[in-house]
């Protein structure tokens, strides 16, 4: 008779019977995993200065920070790969050149969505940090109450008529009242911030996955325009005439992303100690629109171009190629689709740097905060 399935992760903490009496690993061949080695030193150090009550959540916040860094790297490298894909296809045949250019646009936008997800993911971590802080603040109250109870028992066992008992019992009443207030705050803040955190977390994952699915759907339609029929030597390839179709797919993808609605009700933004909205590492404002282009008419042909003009809070990227047989030669230069992310440059200063600040300093420690991460905005590749 088979074992009953488990629907709780709590039962997975103990190793299964098949792994309890395993053969010990070889001592002559050892592969050093740098990432795993770093985690072995980093995660246990979280609890060195953290109260016992907040150790588990402090470790979770630390793990989420590592995951956040991974998302940052994925977003940056995906955008670089999209640039390189379009740069490679520029010298290929007309069909591959156009299709690789449009696929590069869609893949680059997926990277922008991942950067946008980093900002929302950081807000999720901020809510977890709030729970961790309240847990750490309640722990001293519990410890003081327990110590006072032990002291009363000791004094009562030695001298039941001691005058210290009256004073200590009065202090115990005050500590019990303070403990009740702290416990009420703990249960209220924990539920409020737990619900807020995972509303943000699940809503962000849903938004990212559905928008990626939209972009992948249009990427598949564009890829289907490529004729991969084998030809014999000397036979010419049919003339490619899918420029207008691929352009329309990009415009439709922009429009569908702009009209997408998140079914999750977005929680109100968190505020700092001054009542101002908490800022994150990435201050991205996603804009998907169709804008007129007048700065590419007199420019030399190149794969990607920056929009001319005064830069306010970031760099406006244009993913439209101006090479041969592209928008400028099809009479569509007035309506040229472009994704316009608004990304902080590396030279700008962020006042409230959420990622890598005091959240990963152990609660109650006086250690030095970890070094802030640099900005990860990829630069387009010019032909």
Curated annotation (Swiss-Prot):
Transmembrane segments: none annotated. GO terms for cellular component: eisosome filament; plasma membrane. GO terms for biological process: eisosome assembly; endocytosis. Residues 311-324 have a biased composition (Low complexity). It comes from the Eukaryota. Keywords: Phosphoprotein. Pfam families: Pil1. Phosphorylated by ksg1 and ppk21. Phosphorylation is regulated by sphingolipid long chain bases (LCBs). GO terms for molecular function: lipid binding. Residues 325-336, 368-383 have a biased composition (Polar residues). The modification Phosphoserine is found at residue 162. Residues 292-336, 356-383 are annotated as: Disordered. InterPro entries: AH/BAR_dom_sf, PIL1/LSP1. Negative regulator of cell wall integrity (CWI) in unstressed cells, probably by inhibiting protein kinase ksg1/ppk21 activity and regulating their downstream CWI pathways pck2-MAP kinase pathway and protein kinase gad8 pathway. Activity may be regulated by the transient increase of sphingolipid long chain bases (LCBs) during heat stress. PANTHER family: SPHINGOLIPID LONG CHAIN BASE-RESPONSIVE PROTEIN PIL1, SPHINGOLIPID LONG CHAIN BASE-RESPONSIVE PROTEIN PIL2-RELATED. This is Probable sphingolipid long chain base-responsive protein pil2.
């Amino acid at each position: 008779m088979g074992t009953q399935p488990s629907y709780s992760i709590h039962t997975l903490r103990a190793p299964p019977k098949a792994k309890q009496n395993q053969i010990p690993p070889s001592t002559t061949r050892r592969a050093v995993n740098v990432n795993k080695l770093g985690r072995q030193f980093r995660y246990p150090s979280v609890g060195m200065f953290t109260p016992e009550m907040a150790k588990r959540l402090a470790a979770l916040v630390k793990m989420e920070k590592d995951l956040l860094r991974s998302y940052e790297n994925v977003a940056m490298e995906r955008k670089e790969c999209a640039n390189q894909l379009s740069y490679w296809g520029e010298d290929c045949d007309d069909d591959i050149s156009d299709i690789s250019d449009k696929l590069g646009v869609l893949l680059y936008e997926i990277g922008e969505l991942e950067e946008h997800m980093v900002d929302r993911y950081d807000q999720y971590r901020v809510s977890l940090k709030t729970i961790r802080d309240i847990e750490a603040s309640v722990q001293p109250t519990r410890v003081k109450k327990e110590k006072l109870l032990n002291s009363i028992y000791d004094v009562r066992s030695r001298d039941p008529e001691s005058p210290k008992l009256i004073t200590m019992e009065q202090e115990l009443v005050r500590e019990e009242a303070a403990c009740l207030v702290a416990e009420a705050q703990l249960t209220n803040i924990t539920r409020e911030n737990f619900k807020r955190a995972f509303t943000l977390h699940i809503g962000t994952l849903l938004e990212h996955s559905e928008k990626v699915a939209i972009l992948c759907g249009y990427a598949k339609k564009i890829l289907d325009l490529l004729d991969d029929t084998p030809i014999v030597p000397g036979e010419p390839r049919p003339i490619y005439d899918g420029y207008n179709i691929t352009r329309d797919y990009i415009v439709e993808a922009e429009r569908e992303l702009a009209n997408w609605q998140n079914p999750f009700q977005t929680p109100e933004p968190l505020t700092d100690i001054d009542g101002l909205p908490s800022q994150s590492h990435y201050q991205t404002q996603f804009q998907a629109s169709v804008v007129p282009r007048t700065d590419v008419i007199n420019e030399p042909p190149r794969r990607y171009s920056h929009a001319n003009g005064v830069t306010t809070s970031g760099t406006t990227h244009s993913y439209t190629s101006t090479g041969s047989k592209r928008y400028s030669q099809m009479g569509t230069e007035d309506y040229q689709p472009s994704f316009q992310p608004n990304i902080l440059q590396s030279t700008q200063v962020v006042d409230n740097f959420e990622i890598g600040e005091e959240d990963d300093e152990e609660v109650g420690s006086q250690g030095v905060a970890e070094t802030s991460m640099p900005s990860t905005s990829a630069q387009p590749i010019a032909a």
